[in-house]
């Protein structure tokens, strides 16, 4: 009889844990939906502003402040990283990244960088590219902040001006290198809202063998695949060029299950698969959780 009581008690506890996890997942998905709605002009933000794109200085500033407010809701402090980059022999580019540091709970000088760009191309709402990446980054920041044990520090960064040649990430990679941060790995997110075939697979771009193995492991545990590609067209490339272990994370860009609305006026809020975004957020979080708690 005692054994049966114990079994029932365990079942009750596990059921409550599962229900709590599902509730948290639904709550986070709702927040991610709201973030993308604001970034894409589907709803008003700031002083009743409607973003048609995130291309010019004014729209990027509004988007940056909007994301800063969301991150600060998690209790984190946002810092600005203004930069000036030589774009060509006759032109310099100015922009501003924003970042936050989630400190380790134990003494550590190691850092993991999580990043996503917040700008879009001109005349595109940029829902999939890359409001989805920003929403995933927010979700990761919120979940990591809630961890009781963190054996590594986390830097959460929103990059400016990816769409003109990954300029913001280039500036941030140089900033981190000049500061001599001991960086374990860099994980950048770009386009995470399309899954027409509903297989929930993700792609990992140019991962190191160690990062490849851990992403594949956690994907397999969830019954999906993390497919390796050699894509170099997003922010991870700037960190690789600076000598860091970096990986890009995206939907099936090379495996032909990616948004048909890329860099167009039809890359709108209503084209985003929020269930897929939520699932992929959980997958990437599982990877990061293992990396910072082991």
PLM regions: where:
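Bacterial N-terminal signal peptides
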Residues: 7-16
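Solvent-exposed loop/turn segments at secondary-structure junctions
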Residues: 84-88, 105-107, 118-122, 161-165, ...
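N-terminal capping segment at the start of a domain
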Residues: 22-61, 119-120, 189, 257-268, ...
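Acidic/histidine-rich catalytic neighborhood of metal-dependent amide-processing enzymes
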Residues: 94-95, 120-222, 226-228, 236
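A non-catalytic alpha/beta surface segment that caps or lines the substrate-entry region
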Residues: 41-103
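Active-site-adjacent substrate-binding region
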Residues: 197-294
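Extracytoplasmic/secreted proteins, especially bacterial periplasmic and envelope-associated proteins
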Residues: 27-38, 58-78, 132-139, 143, ...
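Structural recognition of the beta-strand scaffold that forms the well-ordered cores
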Residues: 38, 79-80, 97-101, 111-115, ...
């Amino acid at each position: 009889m005692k054994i049966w009581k114990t079994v029932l008690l365990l079942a009750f506890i596990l059921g409550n844990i599962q229900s709590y996890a599902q509730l948290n997942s639904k709550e986070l998905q709702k927040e991610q939906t709201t973030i993308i709605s604001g970034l894409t002009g589907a709803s008003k933000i700031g002083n009743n502003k409607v973003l048609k794109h995130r291309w010019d200085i004014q729209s990027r500033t509004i988007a940056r402040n909007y994301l800063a407010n969301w991150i600060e809701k998690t209790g984190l402090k946002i810092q600005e990283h203004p930069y000036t980059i030589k774009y060509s022999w006759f032109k310099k580019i100015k922009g501003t990244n924003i970042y936050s540091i989630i400190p380790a709970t134990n003494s550590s000088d190691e850092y993991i960088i999580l990043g996503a760009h917040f700008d879009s191309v001109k005349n595109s709402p940029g829902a999939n590219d890359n409001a989805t990446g920003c929403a995933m980054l927010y979700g990761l920041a919120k979940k990591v902040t809630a961890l009781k044990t963190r054996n590594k520090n986390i830097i959460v960064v929103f990059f400016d001006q990816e769409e003109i040649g990954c300029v913001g990430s280039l500036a941030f990679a140089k900033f981190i290198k000049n500061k001599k941060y001991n960086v374990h790995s860099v994980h950048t997110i770009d386009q995470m809202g399309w899954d027409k075939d509903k297989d929930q697979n993700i792609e990992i771009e140019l991962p190191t063998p160690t990062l490849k193995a851990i992403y594949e492991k956690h994907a397999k545990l969830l019954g999906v695949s993390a497919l390796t590609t050699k894509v170099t067209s997003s922010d991870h490339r700037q960190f690789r060029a600076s000598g860091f272990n970096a990986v890009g994370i995206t939907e099936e860009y090379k495996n032909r299950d990616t948004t048909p609305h890329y860099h167009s006026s039809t890359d709108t809020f209503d084209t985003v698969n929020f269930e897929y975004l939520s699932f992929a957020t959980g997958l990437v979080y599982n990877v990061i959780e293992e990396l910072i708690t082991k």
